[in-house]
From Swiss-Prot:
Domain of life: Bacteria
Any single GO CC term annotated in Swiss-Prot or TrEMBL for this entry: plasma membrane
The protein's name in its UniProt record: Ion-translocating oxidoreductase complex subunit C
Binding positions ([4Fe-4S] cluster 1): C377, C380, C383, C426
Top EC class, one word: translocase
Natural source organism: Salmonella newport (strain SL254)
Membrane protein topology class: Peripheral membrane protein
Pfam family, one: SLBB
């Protein structure tokens, strides 16, 4: 009795709520063996054919590749993809892929060479000799992913299971109508599938291994039983046909009686599930050393003349496979990738086959029926009765339409497996699955944005905390510096005190101050006399240089004289004196030219180096500038405007001045000037002083005519130059 009870418990199966029984339509394609499809001339391999990020490219345009050669590198959840055949990489560019919107994803495009040459394959026939980590890494690097539809990387899934997995379930239910890829694979490759299951069991070391298969696959069941006849480590469980019994949570409940909690995974209750196609791919990767480059695809529907299951290379265009099956499209022909309940319609047929492509359905118009108009929900609760996840689809529908994301999340919309059972039974023809997919996408986008905002806030708070710490440390340093002087400051203070003490010690004789005594300045006087003697000696050593330096430019002297005259006139006006006689710019120019000629002649007579001859044209220009400056000073001082100069007379006078200057230069160059006698110069200076004194006396007796500041400035300039030259000549004569 105990044995019978144990046997009953061993083969016991459970049921799940909900579910539907749609027409199976599997007999169209499961009756013919697997066959190969001729190679397509061009393959398009998307870099992302799984859940996770795409891998890093390791080929470039123009490279020749072999079948099984890695096109990308896989790190973490980045699963590598491999070349489906030998050929040449002609492009790496975005291409439309297997997606309801045919989104463009980065793909490697290969032109096949028709040789279909493999890379060097190295199989591990004795896989038990390798470690668990090595087997998982090999499975990952050979590109094995879940072939049941999810596309989750198998290596990552095995690594995450760890030691907490007690039950390994092999999903062979294949519950969706029309699809027979797993059924045909189990009929033709049952031994290889069982070998792959044993590799997975060796990695996970579970207590039990269960194979769940629906009872509508008698040939596959018989083949598996034949292979497992002598096996005691693997149990085959035949379950009733019911859609969607192939769901991960539903099959787990059927075989173990355990329910996966809301928001959880099968691994949370010690269960890990793999598809039969995945087990076959694991066997080829580990034992045969072949990366996943092909998979079984069901070609079915009334629009194809030769339905069946084929080995389709990854990257093969859908059009190529359908044409091989005798595709006869109608006017409004649709092609569905996947089954009629969970699949999606392809916008065009140039998309490639990927790892999750298990079926290509090309139905006729009568087979699918005419599209029906969506009506309002009548709250019949048929969708709730059919839901295998125990959800309330009608409530989720209202929340999705009303953008009530919080309520949709509270009603566990994330647990929806998008099986389509609710839409199948809906009498109002509401596409509930489409609403749920859109709502889940919006919720995921909101959560992603909230996560980014939280990360940004955390970074900001960390920065603020760091700034506060730095500020506190800076204030602490300032306080410590204010309380106690720095070491170098103390050293400087100590050095200064030492110097003061040393000076005090050196002062042995005290300073005595006597009242009424005069200071002894003899040393200071002697130093001053020495500096004077040194200056005289230096001046005598360089008489010519001093002469050259001290000698002023007569042209500059004339300009300075004109400016001096203007300043003197302005000062007279400010002092309130009578306005001087208006300045005649023509006379000023003539006087400036004569003054320059006299100065030049005196320089030549003194024996100094001849100055550069004055250009008459430059003299005329300078005279014009002097006239303009004088006129401007007159206007600023507010004096009466002078009589406007006649330009013709000014030109004549300038020409006469230039002729006189040129004549004086020629005379100075033809005969050398006599050296100036200092005694004569002294006599002339005395006579000049006497004349000046006499003029002053006359000015005191009777009022003189107001002096012309211009003439006074010119005379002063000439006197300064003459005195300077006489002094230089006297020094030369004394030497």
């Amino acid at each position: 009795m105990l044995k019978l009870f144990s046997a009953f418990r061993k083969d016991k199966i459970w049921d799940f709520d909900g579910g539907i029984h749609p027409p199976e339509m599997k007999s169209q394609s499961n009756g013919t063996p697997l066959r190969q499809v001729p190679l397509a001339p061009r393959f398009v391999i998307p870099l992302k054919q799984h859940i996770g990020a795409e891998g890093e490219l390791c080929v470039s345009v123009g490279d020749r590749v072999l079948r099984g050669q890695a096109l990308t590198r896989g790190r973490g959840r980045m699963l590598p993809v491999h070349a489906p055949t030998s050929g040449t990489v002609i492009a790496i560019a975005p291409h439309s892929t297997a997606h309801p919107s045919a989104l463009a994803e980065l793909s490697v495009i290969i032109d096949a060479d028709g040789e279909d040459r493999w890379i060097e394959r190295e199989g591990w026939s004795d896989y038990r000799a390798h470690s668990r980590e090595a087997l998982i890494e090999r499975i990952h690097q050979y590109g094995v992913a879940g072939l049941g539809g999810a596309g989750f990387p198998t290596g990552v899934k095995l690594q995450g299971g760890g030691d907490k997995i007690t039950t390994l379930i092999i999903n062979a239910a294949e519950c969706e109508p029309y699809i027979t890829a797993d059924d045909r694979l189990m009929q033709d490759c049952a031994a290889q599938i069982v070998e792959g299951i044993r590799i997975l069991a060796h990695i996970l070391q579970p207590r039990e291994v269960l194979i769940g298969i629906e009872d509508n696959k008698p040939q596959a069941i018989s083949m598996l039983r034949a292979v497992l006849a002598d096996a005691h480590d693997i149990s085959l469980r035949v379950i009733p046909t019911k859609y969607p019994s192939g769901g991960a949570k539903q099959l787990t409940q059927i075989l173990t009686g355990k329910q996966v909690p809301h928001g959880g995974r099968s691994s949370d209750i010690g269960v890990l599930m793999q598809n039969v196609g995945t087990a076959y791919a694991v066997k080829r990767a580990v034992i045969d050393g072949e990366p996943i480059t092909e998979r079984v695809v069901t070609l079915t529907g009334e629009a194809v003349s030769r339905p069946g299951n084929v080995w389709a290379r990854l990257g093969t265009p859908v059009r190529h496979l359908l044409n091989d099956a005798g595709f006869c499209p109608s006017a409004d022909q649709m092609v569905i990738m996947g089954g009629p309940l969970m699949g999606f319609t392809l916008p065009w047929l140039d998309v490639p086959v990927v790892k999750i492509t298990n079926c290509l359905l090309a139905p006729s118009v009568t087979e699918m029926g005419a599209p029906q108009e969506e009506k309002s929900c009548i709250r019949c609760s048929a969708c709730a009765d059919a839901c295998p996840a125990d959800l309330l689809p009608q409530q989720l529908y209202w929340f999705s339409k009303g953008q009530q994301h919080d309520k949709a999340t509270a009603h566990h919309i994330a647990d929806c497996i998008e099986c389509g059972a609710c839409a199948w039974v809906c009498p109002s023809n509401i596409p509930l699955v489409q609403y749920f997919r859109q709502e889940k996408a919006e919720i995921n986008a909101i959560r992603l944005e909230e996560k980014r905002a939280a990360e940004a806030k955390a970074r900001f708070e960390a920065r603020q905390a760091r700034l506060e710490r730095e500020k506190a440390a800076r204030l602490a340093r300032h306080k410590s510096a204010a309380v106690q002087p720095a070491a170098k400051d103390q050293d400087a203070i100590a050095a200064a005190l030492a110097r003061v003490k040393e000076k005090q010690a050196q002062a042995t004789q005290p300073v005595v101050i006597q009242a009424g005594s005069l200071p002894d300045n003899s040393a200071v006087i002697a130093a001053r006399e020495a500096r004077k003697a040194q200056a005289r000696a230096k001046q005598a050593a360089h008489p010519v240089a001093d002469s050259a330096i001290s000698g002023g430019d007569p042209r500059k002297a004339a300009v300075e004289a004109a400016i001096a005259r203007a300043k003197a006139r302005k000062q007279e006006q400010q002092a309130g004196s009578e306005p001087a006689e208006p300045v005649d710019p023509r006379k000023a120019a003539v006087e400036a030219a004569i003054a320059r000629a006299k100065v030049r002649k005196q320089e030549q007579q003194a024996g100094s180096e001849p100055a550069e001859p004055v250009d008459p044209r430059k003299a005329a220009v300078e005279a014009a500038i002097a006239r303009a400056k004088a006129r401007k000073h007159e206007q600023q001082a507010g004096s009466e405007p002078a009589e406007p100069a006649d330009p013709r007379k000014a030109a004549v006078e300038a020409a006469i001045a230039r002729a006189k200057a040129r004549k004086q230069e020629q005379q100075a160059g033809s005969e050398p000037a006599e050296p100036v006698d200092p005694r004569k110069a002294a006599v002339e200076a005395a006579i000049a002083r006497a004349k000046a004194r006499k003029q002053e006396q006359q000015a005191g007796s009777e009022p003189a005519e107001p002096a012309d500041p211009r003439k006074a400035a010119v005379a002063a300039a000439i006197a300064r130059v003459q005195a300077k030259k006489a002094a230089q000549q006297q020094v030369v004569n004394e030497d």
